Structures are given as C-alpha cells and as structure tokens.
Amino acid sequence: MKIMRKNHPLLKIVNHSFIDLPTPSNISSWWNFGSLLGICLMIQILTGLFLAMHYTSDTTTAFSSVAHICRDVNYGWLIRYLHANGASMFFICLFIHVGRGIYYGSYTLSETWNIGIILFLTTMATAFVGYVLPWGQMSFWGATVITNLLSAIPYIGSTLVEWIWGGFSVDKATLTRFFAFHFILPFIITALVLVHLLFLHETGSNNPSGLNSDSDKIPFHPYYTFKDLLGILLLLMALMILALFFPDILGDPDNYTPANPLNTPAHIKPEWYFLFAYAILRSIPNKLGGVLALILSILILATFPLLNTSKQHGLIYRPITQTIYWIFIANLLVLTWIGGQPVEYPFTMIGQIASITYFGIIIILMPISNTIENNIIKL
C-alpha cells in the first residue's frame, strides 16, 4: 500500500497533499480552521443536494416546499437546519481563518492569500443567493435591496438590475436563476479550494513563530490528521447543538412569513455574517459611495501584502500592531452589532465612526505601527 500511494498517479497527489506533506512542527490549533472549512463545505454540498431534491424554485411553491421538507420528508427538518446553521459555522471558521492569516502574517504568501479573497467573495455570493431561496419576507426584501444596489453604477446600473432580475422586479425568473447560481457556486468554490491548496503547498505553510521552518518539518499524517480530527469533532458537536437545540437562533423570524411585495418588514437586514459589511454600506449617505465601501470592505484584504513593511513576520513579537489588531477585531464586532440595529441615532453615528476606524486601521495605523516597530529594532 505504501508503494502504491507513492507511485499511483492519482493516489500520489493525495499522498503529497494530505499524508507525506512536510508540515511545520509548531503550528497551533489556529491552523485547524482550513480543514474545518473543508468539512463545512462537504456538509453544505451534501445537505444542499438532499434539499435540492425536494425544493421547487417557483415563487408560488418555494415557501411551501421548504415547509414540506421540514414536515413531510424523513429527517428533512434536520437536513434543513444543518444546512442553515452549517452556513453560520462556515462563516465563523472563515472569519477565524482570515483573522489568523492577518495575525500570523500569512498574507506574505500572496498567491494563496489572493485566491483566499476570491474564495471569500464567492462564498459570500453563494450565501446571499441561498438566503433568497426559502422565499420568506426577509429573503424577498433582502434580494430586492441588495440587487438594487447595482443601480448605483453609472449608465448601465438600471439595465444591469433588470438583467439580473429577469424582469422589472424580483420574481419567478430571479428565484429560478438564484437557485441555479446557488447550486453551481459550491462546485466553483471546491475548484478554487484546490487552487488555494496548490499555491499553499508550493510555498509550504506559515507557522506561529514566523521563522523559516524547513529544518524542522514533520509529515502531515498521523500528527496533524489526528489534531484536525479533534477540531472536526468539536465543530460537528457545535453544529449539532445549534441544529437540534437552537435551530432558529441565528435566523430571522420574518423569514417564517411568506414573501409579500406589498408589505415591507420594519428592518431589512441580511444574515449575521454580512452585518459588518451592511453597516459599512449604510454608514455612507451616498448610494454609489456605499456600494464602493461595501466592495472595498472585502477587497481591502488584498492590500495587506502591499502595505506590509515590517521586518518581522506576523504579530507575535509586535506589541503595538498586536494592540491595533485587537482594536480592529473589536471594531468588527461593533460593526456587526450596528448592522442589525435600526437606522436611527445613535446607531448611524456609531456605524460611521466604526466604518472610518475599519479602513483607517488597515490603511493608516498598521503601516505606521510597522514603521515604528522597525525603528525600535534599530535602536
């Protein structure tokens, strides 16, 4: 078997990626989240496949087909709640994965980092079109509000919105194409994950110390397969607790009301994992400015390799930047909170301050702290 896995054309790829892969001996549990994201993706594809067997992408029957899945299909309620809460677990792992990348300076592996940003955007697009499918009130109005943002694009905006809608409003054509997008995008994500891993294995993994670890590497299996297994068990336990005991805690009660174009919900808001970006969007009074800020809130991650001037790798020995990093995380939590609040004083003002802080930390404070720390090293 040993010779086969090293010589067989297909098994050789698996062997070099997951078994004999030379891995730094000191990587911590923060490196577990890559494999957890892979597990989340597998759970989402499998549960989504079974849901797609019973779902109908028609405005008249979409809502009742979801109710039918929960009531009449064997374990349909479990599959539905695993899929809905699995998305939340996916984004929790994704945020931690990106946060770890920033903290330990993984953005210096620029190809891997940039593919990661594309993956992040694709996952957000998948989650958005998926949220529209149950055709509840928040699904309908979320789709209307977010797709309408494209009308802010000069000259082609209105035409583009109607082209995406497939008509003059969010209707049957929109739901059908969103279902098609939601079905195909996870497979595109899977392909991008393979490219992400390809670039990662080209350079090798980063490690907590930020030093070159070529002289001290161990095989991925059995050391990290068992370490990852613990993380996977904890993830599955958390997901099952969510799906079985608190299935609706992260959802919106408005989505249990069928979509009604004549009745607008009091507060239109997306799922919790989009709230930080939604808060940034709302904090700018101008429509086009808001859309640009929304896009930049994710694309700004691509500036990390460009703005990094530090002579040290990662933040482990950099107390000034470490402090700024944790302020950034706290600010992100404030933005998430503000995104779920109504558009009124003092929430609008807090949102504007937090949005300025979000961009200010990345573009101004982190490069300044890099320079200060470089000068301290010279002393």
UniProtKB/Swiss-Prot annotation:
Its cofactor is heme b. GO terms for biological process: mitochondrial electron transport, ubiquinol to cytochrome c. GO terms for cellular component: mitochondrial inner membrane; respiratory chain complex III. Its main location: mitochondrion. Heme b b562 binds at residues 83, 182. Component of the ubiquinol-cytochrome c reductase complex (complex III or cytochrome b-c1 complex) that is part of the mitochondrial respiratory chain. The b-c1 complex mediates electron transfer from ubiquinol to cytochrome c. Contributes to the generation of a proton gradient across the mitochondrial membrane that is then used for ATP synthesis. Heme 1 (or BL or b562) is low-potential and absorbs at about 562 nm, and heme 2 (or BH or b566) is high-potential and absorbs at about 566 nm. This is Cytochrome b.
